[in-house]
A protein has these predicted regions:
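N-terminal accessory nucleic-acid engagement/regulatory domains that precede
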Residues: 1-32
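N-terminal cationic amphipathic segment used for targeting or macromolecule association
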Residues: 10-12, 36, 211, 274
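N-terminal pre-Walker A segment at the start of P-loop NTPase domains
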Residues: 20-56
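P-loop NTPase motor domains
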Residues: 42-51, 56-345
């Protein structure tokens, strides 16, 4: 029976609200502020009756939403898809099965969206993403290294600080070296795999490259990390290099098999015009899947920098929303909570 003050259960809040309480929430937490209804593009859809403004300072509440539920409980079809079809701002969508892309592509295009797809299951038909092109300084390369190490750890990991620091120094040296030079085809994870594969040889090409870099800039971060790696005993260094090469083995194939050979997704432009970037098929590409946490980490850094230094008001033209289905399967994103706080500030 319908009562005069029908209670509406809001599972996200674990509370039961009356209609008056819902109206009060709408007045203070979503657009248009001060009204007891929700309307406009600048709201996230939480439920049929509850919306939440992106404007955290006005709404006095963070616009980050965590949805928990068992298989087939409606997380994708009842939460992610409606927000995507709301078509407000730009989106980055984790879509492992490709279902969201199929159901929304036509509608989004009709609304003027540019569609970009990183398809791990079909690299030949995919857009490209090269994480090295979004690295600027030593902190960026360190984050790449952390993403790579954390997301390629074997299940039988043995905690050995010396080994971990040796691999970290090697990857930091190689990534920083490639980033500093940005020589087209040579600034790729494929080239990084080649360099770590030859790093164990003393006096060979690897040493020559870094000694030449030392002449140009002795305190280059790449050179400093190289010097740390060269402190590793030769026998141990060979094992470290073999392990490092295995971590990058997924990027040692042909260009058509590797979506990191080029970059066509232009992360820095996502806030300039309405764009939907889909990350799909990664359930079929376990090794190249390491690119997803790299992309998410770099997305925050890139957009925050773009907004701060390339927009007079410090805000992007288009709000960028992450809709991350099956989030636990995405992998480890370094300092995610800090990135969320900075990205929504």
């Amino acid at each position: 029976m319908k009562k005069e003050n029908e209670k509406v259960c809001q599972s996200a809040e674990a509370l039961c609200w009356t209609e008056d309480e819902i109206k009060e929430f709408n007045r203070t937490h979503n657009s248009p502020f001060g009204e007891d209804y929700a309307q406009g593009e600048d709201n996230l859809l939480v439920s049929k009756n509850i919306f939440l403004s992106w404007n955290d300072s006005m709404a006095r509440r963070r616009s980050d939403i965590l949805v928990l539920g068992s298989t087939a409980s409606g997380k994708t079809s009842c939460v992610i898809l409606p927000n995507l079809m709301h078509a407000s701002g730009s989106y980055v969508v984790a879509d492992p099965s490709g279902e969201l892309l199929k159901r929304s592509r036509a509608a989004l295009r009709q609304k003027g969206y540019a569609i970009r797809v990183l398809d791990f299951a079909n690299p030949a038909a995919s857009d490209g993403y090269n994480p090295l092109l979004y690295s600027v300084d030593a902190e960026d390369t360190l984050n790449l290294t952390r993403c790579l190490l954390e997301n390629t750890e074997p299940g039988n990991k043995v905690n050995d600080p010396f080994w971990e620091k040796s691999e970290t120094a090697l990857f930091n040296a190689v990534f920083a070296f490639l980033v500093r030079r940005r020589q087209g085809e040579k600034c790729t994870l494929h080239e990084a795999h080649r360099l770590v594969s030859i790093a164990a040889e003393r006096g060979g090409e690897f040493d020559a490259l870094f000694e030449e870099a030392r002449k140009r800039k002795p305190n280059d971060p790449a050179v400093l990390s190289y010097d740390v790696f060269r402190l590793v005993p030769e026998k141990t260094a060979k094992a470290v290099c073999a392990s490092a090469a295995e971590r990058l083995a997924a990027f040692n194939g042909k260009p058509l098999e590797d979506i990191s050979y080029c970059d066509t997704i232009a992360l820095d432009e996502l806030g300039d015009a309405k764009t939907a970037l889909f990350l799909t098929g990664f359930h079929a590409a376990e090794k190249q899947k390491v690119l997803i946490p790299m992309l998410i980490a770099q997305l925050f850094n890139t957009l925050v920098y773009h907004a701060a230094f390339e927009y007079d008001e410090g805000e992007l033209k288009e709000h960028v929303t992450l809709l991350l289905d099956e989030f636990p399967n995405i992998g480890y994103v370094p300092e995610l909570s800090s990135r969320l706080a900075c990205g929504t500030a």
